[in-house]
Amino acid sequence: MSRTASITRTTSETSIELMLDLDGTGNTDIATGIGFFDHMLTALGRHAMLDLIVRAEGDLHIDAHHTVEDVGIVLGQAIREALGDKRGITRFGFAATPMDEALCEAAIDLSGRGFLVFDVPFERPMLGDMDTQLVQEFFQALTANGGFALHLTRRAGHNAHHVAEAAFKAAARALRMAVEPDPRAAGAIPSTKGVL
């Protein structure tokens, strides 16, 4: 069964087209108009082993907020759609990912309930053309629309670029683990409730 999704979302603020393959090889083609965000989405796709195509046009003359948040919304929707009823998945994932002096941890539960615990402070306000506050906004939109819990924590680091990249890579590696098929639970819903 193909675990893919293709979603288009257009509002008065943004226009987004996204294609996702959960069983990809990490091939990405990202264009949001926000250089640093493109870099982070590329890292997310590569380390989650997702094939990911994103085309986004937004009201960048205001700022990057709507574009970053709306890409999170659409990517979350795509992950949820591609997972289907979640039969046979591992469900939980965890990763601790360093980048030089920075270290971030991520834990994911594909529970069907969107929840974010975000403890990733930044020591400067901007990453290129992206406000550091938008990192949390992205993950908030992603988890709410993806229907999964994510705990994301900075354990060490002071370079804002390194911290952000470690956070995205940790989330990616945890997601990769969680969506992987569990050979011991083929066809089973990984929940005592029988539904996720």
From Swiss-Prot:
Identify which top EC class this enzyme belongs to. lyase
Q: Where in the cell is it found?
A: Cytoplasm
Q: Does the keyword Phosphoprotein apply?
A: no
In terms of domain of life, where is this protein from? Bacteria
Q: What is its EC number?
A: 4.2.1.19
Question: Which PROSITE patterns does this UniProt record tie to the protein?
Answer: IGP_DEHYDRATASE_1, IGP_DEHYDRATASE_2
Under Pfam families, the record lists: IGPD
* Biochemical pathway: Amino-acid biosynthesis; L-histidine biosynthesis; L-histidine from 5-phospho-alpha-D-ribose 1-diphosphate: step 6/9
Can you tell me which family this protein belongs to? Belongs to the imidazoleglycerol-phosphate dehydratase family.
List GO terms (cellular component aspect): cytoplasm
Q: Which UniProt keywords apply?
A: Amino-acid biosynthesis, Cytoplasm, Histidine biosynthesis, Lyase
Q: What lineage is on file? A: Bacteria, Pseudomonadati, Pseudomonadota, Alphaproteobacteria, Acetobacterales
**NCBIfam families recorded for this chain?**
PRK00951.1-5, PRK00951.2-1, PRK00951.2-4
Instruction: Specify whether Cytoplasm is a keyword of the entry.
Output: yes
State the organism named in the record.
Acidiphilium cryptum (strain JF-5)
Q: What is this protein called?
A: Imidazoleglycerol-phosphate dehydratase
Q: Which GO terms describe its biological process?
A: L-histidine biosynthetic process
- Reaction(s) this enzyme catalyzes, per UniProt: D-erythro-1-(imidazol-4-yl)glycerol 3-phosphate = 3-(imidazol-4-yl)-2-oxopropyl phosphate + H2O
Q: Which GO terms describe its molecular function?
A: imidazoleglycerol-phosphate dehydratase activity
